[in-house]
């Protein structure tokens, strides 16, 4: 319990102390923001600060800090450390700079930001990468909720069309089209803050349930410092990839520009971007604590949690909420596992539209231009989603790559932020250090993950268990990170000699 409370205090303190350092390093001023300067009534709309925070939280969170934290809890309370320090020194820094760099560049999408600071080749790579990732996320977050709604209807004894995934998938996709097409203040600005509040209430309810029920005890880090993973999966770098949104997520960089286009003042960035990520870290910490405390531990392994997750992550959420909050928890769980993915899905499609708009220089005040982009984006999503609902397309293999690509995107954004700070003659180490760390994480996982190169490097025991080739992957991952850092330092040294290099950024 004390480990949890200490980490919670560090997260809250990190917002004020380290978040203040990050804000001071960036240096927000009183310049006119894109929302005030452009104000097209569609994507550039001034919103109140509390709505900015809640929408940003819901956009970046969804079920990420719940699913990722529960999976991360398989390693035991050691996951508390990554959630805490990863959020403070990496995730919140990443979210703040991805949002504020966008704000300084007229609300540009992250692919355009990467192009400005990392070069034209990286811009084109990020454009394609971002659109594919966003459409994939949006599609999966349409299929998932549709399936959950069908489960509810079937459990209630309903049959016919309302008990088919295809029916609800079409309804979700129609909603996605509307939310992607219309002004951000019409649906997202009105409803999403309420869902954000529900996400926070659900986390608070789980925390209260854990502390008030004597049968649940949160284990201490110092008593369980080693890995408790039932499958023996290494902490490095699997835990860092698995927790994903609960500590740092590249997907957030695709969402932050949405709110960067709605801020009235640059000084709102600390609360909206850094603060929302810290809040997500707190939510992840609570759910990780739930995973560590509510289930049976056998022989130092989280066998009970593993069994619960084997029934499906949504079922695990339902179980945690019902155990800690009873009937109210069940209602919140249903809202969470259905509404939260939908809210992440539609903003994913909206972000895809904006990435394409920036790519092809199409202003979005015109409804015709929005329609031109919405139709193909949602069309591809519909084809993939309906194909999945009909059993023609399997996302399982594709989705395995999401966690790795997610953290790799975060790595790229942090390197872009480092270049930004170099051009601005600021302390670039504040982003270069987490960029180097995430480079090591991403490369190591790419070598160890069975869906990546691990299928060639790892071996199997007689009973089918994976033996990870850490002797090869660990040193290569570290060396690769050092090489990336060396390339960065060489690049800034070279550019430092160029005349007026500081004018290359805004």
Question: What is the meaning of each model-derived region?
Answer:
Residues 1-19, 72-102, 111, 330, ...:
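Extracellular loop-to-transmembrane helix junctions
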Residues 9-27, 129, 145-149, 165-212, ...:
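Membrane-interface loop-to-helix entry segments
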Residues 10-66, 268:
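Membrane-interface "cap" regions at the ends of multi-pass membrane proteins
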Residues 48-64, 207-215, 224-287, 332-344:
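Hydrophobic, membrane-embedded alpha-helices of multi-pass small-molecule transporters
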Residues 99, 209-221, 274-319, 386-393:
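Extracellular/periplasmic helix-exit of transmembrane alpha-helices
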């Amino acid at each position: 319990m004390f480990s949890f409370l200490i980490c919670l205090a560090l997260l809250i303190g990190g917002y004020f102390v380290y978040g203040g350092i990050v804000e001071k390093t960036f240096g927000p001023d009183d310049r006119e923001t894109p929302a005030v300067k452009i104000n097209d009534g569609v994507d550039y709309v001034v919103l109140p600060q509390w709505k900015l925070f809640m929408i940003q939280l819901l956009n970046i969170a969804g079920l990420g800090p719940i699913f990722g934290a529960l999976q991360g809890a398989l390693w035991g309370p050691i996951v508390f450390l990554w959630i805490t320090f990863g959020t403070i020194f990496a995730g919140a820094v990443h979210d703040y700079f991805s949002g504020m760099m966008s704000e300084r560049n007229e609300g540009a999408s992250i692919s355009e930001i990467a192009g400005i600071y990392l070069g034209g080749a990286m811009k084109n790579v990020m454009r394609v990468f971002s659109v594919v990732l966003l459409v994939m996320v949006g599609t999966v977050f349409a299929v998932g909720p549709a399936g959950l709604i069908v489960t509810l209807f079937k459990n209630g004894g309903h049959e016919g069309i309302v008990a088919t995934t295809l029916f609800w998938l079409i309804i979700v996709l129609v909603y996605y089209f509307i939310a992607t097409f219309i002004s951000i203040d019409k649906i997202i600005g009105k409803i999403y803050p309420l869902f954000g509040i529900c996400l926070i209430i659900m986390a608070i309810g789980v925390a209260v349930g854990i502390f008030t029920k004597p049968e649940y005890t949160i284990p201490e880090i110092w008593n369980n410092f080693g890995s408790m993973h039932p499958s023996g999966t290494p902490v490095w770098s699997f835990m860092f990839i698995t927790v994903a949104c609960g500590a740092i997520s590249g997907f957030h960089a695709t969402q932050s520009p949405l709110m960067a286009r709605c801020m009235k003042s640059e000084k709102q960035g600390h609360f909206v971007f850094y603060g929302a990520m810290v809040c997500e870290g707190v939510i992840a910490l609570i759910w990780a604590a739930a995973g560590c405390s509510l289930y049976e531990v056998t022989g130092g392994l989280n066998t009970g949690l593993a069994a619960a997750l084997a029934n499906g992550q949504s079922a695990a959420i339902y179980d945690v909420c019902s155990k800690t909050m009873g009937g109210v928890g069940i209602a919140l769980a249903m809202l969470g596992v259905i509404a939260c993915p939908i809210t992440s899905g539609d903003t994913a499609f909206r972000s895809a539209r904006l990435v394409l708009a920036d790519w092809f220089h199409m202003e979005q005040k015109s409804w015709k231009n929005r329609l031109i982009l919405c139709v193909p984006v949602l069309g591809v999503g519909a084809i993939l989603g309906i194909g999945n609902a009909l059993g023609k397309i399997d996302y399982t293999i594709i989705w395995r790559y999401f966690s790795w690509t997610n953290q790799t995107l975060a790595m790229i954004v942090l390197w872009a932020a480092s270049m930004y700070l170099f051009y601005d003659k600021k302390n670039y180490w504040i982003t270069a250090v987490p960029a180097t760390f995430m480079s090591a994480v991403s490369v190591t996982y790419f070598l160890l993950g069975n869906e990546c190169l691990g299928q060639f490097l790892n071996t199997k025991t007689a009973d089918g268990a994976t033996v990870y080739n850490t002797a090869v992957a660990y040193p290569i991952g570290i060396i690769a990170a050092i090489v990336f850092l060396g390339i960065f330092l060489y690049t800034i040294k070279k550019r430092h000699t160029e005349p007026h290099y500081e004018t290359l950024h805004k």
